[in-house]
């Protein structure tokens, strides 16, 4: 599996764009979330050129995770696009309805079903689903709107926009890479997002390959950045940075 980091910030762009990650796995190209990080696809044209289809899996529908859908247009003119997202019973509308509303003609000149040569939208549930022989495990998280952990073949677990929930990591193994949001440098009692101390404490009894901290807070002060650096130096934790690639 190859993992390309396209958008490691939460909320708004800064040093990084917002949530977007590109995976190459078992001859499939998978994108996690559609934040402004989609704009970094220009740096990965060589990756895109190897595939005829892009599969997107959305964790939820907050704008910093879907607004980049409009940036897909120049890259997918000759490709198939399949988008999985949470629909009913977690949300009132389907994935296709939410994204179609975002791309109404008042807001963008190209409708959803014209973003690529062929566009298919599918709703997922916590029953999970498969992409060819790739197993996708879905678990609901705690957030202001329903968000979902995405586990890909137990090699990569994507957990963003969530309070830390250690019970959701029972599938983790020594070969698992974890993409986990890190919004707070210290534990402030935030019930919608995760702090680094709670993440590190909650995962201390789990064996894993690496934790890449993502959905980073653009408002961190220099003091908070130093706190984080001092906590993760010499550990299996690292801060996500746009443009980086991991091969595992």
Model-inferred region functions:
Residues 164-246:
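Cap/insert and terminal regions of metallo-dependent hydrolase folds
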Residues 60, 161, 215:
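Active-site glycine-centered loops adjacent to acidic/histidine catalytic or metal-binding residues
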Residues 35-36, 161, 183-184:
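Short glycine-/small-residue-rich Rossmann-like dinucleotide-binding loops
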Residues 1-158, 226-248:
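Binuclear metal-dependent hydrolase catalytic cores
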